[in-house]
Swiss-Prot record:
Protein name: Oxygen-dependent coproporphyrinogen-III oxidase
Ligand binding (substrate): S92, N108, V109, R110, G258, G259, R260
Family under the similarity heading: Belongs to the aerobic coproporphyrinogen-III oxidase family.
GO biological process per UniProt: protoporphyrinogen IX biosynthetic process
The UniProt record lists the keyword Manganese: yes
Annotated binding of Mn(2+), by residue: H96, H106, H145, H175
Positions in coiled-coil regions: none
Active site: H106 (proton donor)
Gene: hemF
Source taxon at top rank: Bacteria
EC number: 1.3.3.3
Keyword terms, alphabetized: Cytoplasm, Heme biosynthesis, Manganese, Metal-binding, Oxidoreductase, Porphyrin biosynthesis
């Protein structure tokens, strides 16, 4: 089947609705929607929940942008795209909970298509989800990765290990020599064997995110914590900011294409702190995180 951008867009709009409803049901607060248009073509719906019962900030963004020329960040690793018009659409979300025992989570599913007269369209899907705990619980990590593995299973035995490895490699802070979290799934440039197969996989990832995340939220959201745990959470959020501004391809793509800055930076935590040469005490739960986030097979 030929790529059907309209069908993908409808799925993404529905996915944004569903995820917002599911997060609101857990939190008790509602998302506020901000619709926007992009001068160069396209627009989107940004939805933010702030200072809820469970989530300090949750942002779920839908965007659909198009233009006559592909930006440098996209053509750098796909030189054949130079000179083509493009459409890019996706849902991207980040959830920053109040409670330091509830991990931060991120998910994204997206579709690109680039066309020029007289040539076959170039298209691909990308996306994934990843988890960033501040305090590690093995049962949470196992559940997260088991959910990821199970949704990959119908698409082939090698799919989960391949996209888990890619996720571990992608969400890595080279300047810190550490992982951002415990990973999950990451895929990009997916366009084989055909459109229907790739679209079905992207849908499975989009729908699988809340199955992976919400049981962990329910398990941890009422755990007691104090100033020490909160300070550590804010300190570790700094790594999130560093990754997004220095290494994340999606952030760079959005800023280079004249995307909406407020929506692109919606992934930022509302509060964060840095501390010069911070070293957690040996044997403390905070020190244990360094070991917990190292790459391993969780399932």
């Amino acid at each position: 089947m030929k790529p059907d951008a309209h069908q993908v867009k409808q799925f993404l709009l529905n996915l944004q609705d569903t995820i917002c409803q599911q997060l609101s049901a857990v939190d008790g607060a509602e998302f506020v929607e901000d619709s926007w248009l992009r001068e160069a073509g396209g627009g989107g719906r940004s939805r933010v929940l702030r200072n809820g019962g469970v989530f300090e900030q949750a942002g779920v963004n839908f965007s659909h942008v198009h233009g006559e020329v592909m930006p440098a960040s996209a053509t750098a690793h796909r030189p054949e795209l130079a000179g083509r018009s493009f459409e890019a659409m996706g849902v991207s979300l980040v959830v920053h909970p109040h409670n330091p025992y509830v991990p931060t989570s991120h998910a994204n599913v997206r579709f690109f298509i680039a066309e020029k007269p007289g040539a076959e369209p170039v298209w691909w899907f990308g996306g994934g989800f990843d988890l960033t705990p501040f305090y590690g619980f093995e049962e949470d990590a196992i559940h997260w990765h088991r959910t990821a593995r199970d949704l990959c299973q119908p698409f082939g035995e090698d799919v989960y290990p391949r996209y888990k490895k890619w996720c571990d490699e992608y969400f890595y802070l080279k300047h810190r020599n550490e992982q951002r979290g415990i990973g999950g799934l990451f895929f990009d440039d997916l366009n084989t064997p055909d459109f229907d197969h790739c679209f079905a996989f992207m849908q499975a990832v989009g729908k699988g995110y809340t199955n992976a995340y919400l049981p962990i939220v329910e398990r941890r959201k009422t755990m007691a914590y104090g100033e020490r745990e909160r300070n550590f959470q804010l300190y570790r959020r700094g790594r999130y900011v560093e990754f997004n501004l220095v290494w994340d391809r999606g952030t760079l793509f959005g800023l280079q294409t004249g995307g909406r800055t407020e929506s692109i930076l919606m992934s930022m935590p509302p509060l964060v702190r840095w501390e010069y040469d911070y070293q957690p005490k040996d044997g403390s739960p905070e020190a244990a995180l360094n070991e917990f986030i190292k790459v391993r097979d969780w399932v």
